[in-house]
């Protein structure tokens, strides 16, 4: 199963300190956390100065409860797939990312990771699913930049971030294809034993 601790360094690599770019639709951010998100989790009375003082503990709390757990990522078998889904949720919001992934999977696009969505993720051929999600995410940011011209200056950075994610098979990947492969190995071992 995927481990959130393996994703955190990948996200933090792309998130600096406090930024207040007037062209950024998210407004003031610190370590990738917007003021609106900070207020959602720690109170509507929180100020920009409170956001500037965001602690690592607060960051982890938001990351886990607002993004990782929303995607049920601990129940995703492949780490690379969990990483790219949760990072998309982090960048675009969980509902948006989950709906896009559900569209790829052909499940109901309700923005909630339930048993059917989770099963579809874990039973898909991992590399193909990862590549489809990555391609969809690249197209998504292209569309955002097209629809919001002021965001075009961020497009190359968004694409570089997405392209920094690579597929890894991972020992934890035991979806349908992993189970079939394990079964095939078991059968071969039985045959080899029989002919000894």
Where on the chain are the PLM-derived regions?
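Cell-wall polysaccharide-cleaving catalytic domain and substrate-binding groove, primarily
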Residues: 1-180, 187-196
